[in-house]
Amino acid sequence: MRILCTNDDGIHAPGLKVVEEIARALSDDVWVVAPELDQSGVSHSLSLNDPLRLREVGPRHFAVRGTPTDCVIMGARHILADKAPDLVLSGVNRGRNVAEDVVYSGTIAGALEGTILGLPSFALSQEFTLETRNAPLWDTAKAHGPEILRKAIKAGVPKNTVININFPACAPDEVAGVMVTRQGKRNQGFLRIDERHDGRGNPYFWIGFERIAVVDMPAEGTDLAALAAKYVSVTPLRLDRTDEAFSATLAKTLG
């Protein structure tokens, strides 16, 4: 089985080494094609106005000056043009990708691009806490990732579905189990705009995050609830985002 690994944290990110280790537990035919620079939050961005620069950093290891989407296309359509990959793994992201993160995540986008190309694809992310922010518990992903992937692959991933896996911020032996979940929703009040000024007094801005008190517990069955209970969250996400239920209502209203 030929496996293509990518991420959004960049070619030198610790999590990329983790996903490669997970991949090697499944196959010895592992290829890494990852962004030259950190691409966190770029979502499913595709480089159309800038050329892609490709650099071989080692055997079967390539850096692309582009997005995770660019990397998967470059890997599947150029580097591995002679024999396409059988599986795409994107991650392991430093930090969870749950709830609304799904829309912003370059990690998930890398897996989504694999799905678009007709390849079984998985996004993997490791949650951290304030205490483990500088040293996420990568051993949790290493310990549980291979077996979860084996079972999910055996189940047969539908062609238009990507699997989003999030590992809880706890030691491997503290993981409560594996839970198949749905995408959660959280209070977006933590987003803020931070205004600053440069040396000439001109304003510039950062999108930032601030800690807010958690009032309500996450809804049962969601990715958020699973991680809070120390479960590995496994969420099947569909490429087709059509709201079928509302489509019928809208058709009656507009028809």
Curated annotation (Swiss-Prot):
Family matches, as Gene3D superfamilies: Survival protein SurE-like phosphatase/nucleotidase
SUPFAM superfamilies: SurE-like
GO molecular-function term, one example from the UniProt record: exopolyphosphatase activity
Catalyzed reactions: a ribonucleoside 5'-phosphate + H2O = a ribonucleoside + phosphate
Binding site for a divalent metal cation: 8-9, 40, 93
Cofactor(s) the protein requires to work: a divalent metal cation
Keyword annotations of the record: Cytoplasm, Hydrolase, Metal-binding, Nucleotide-binding
One Pfam assignment: SurE
InterPro entries, alphabetized: SurE, SurE-like_Pase/nucleotidase, SurE-like_sf
Gene Ontology CC, one term: cytoplasm
Cofactor note: Binds 1 divalent metal cation per subunit.
E.C. numbers: 3.1.3.5
Record localization: Cytoplasm
Function: Nucleotidase that shows phosphatase activity on nucleoside 5'-monophosphates.
Family to which this protein belongs: Belongs to the SurE nucleotidase family.
Protein name from the UniProt record: 5'-nucleotidase SurE
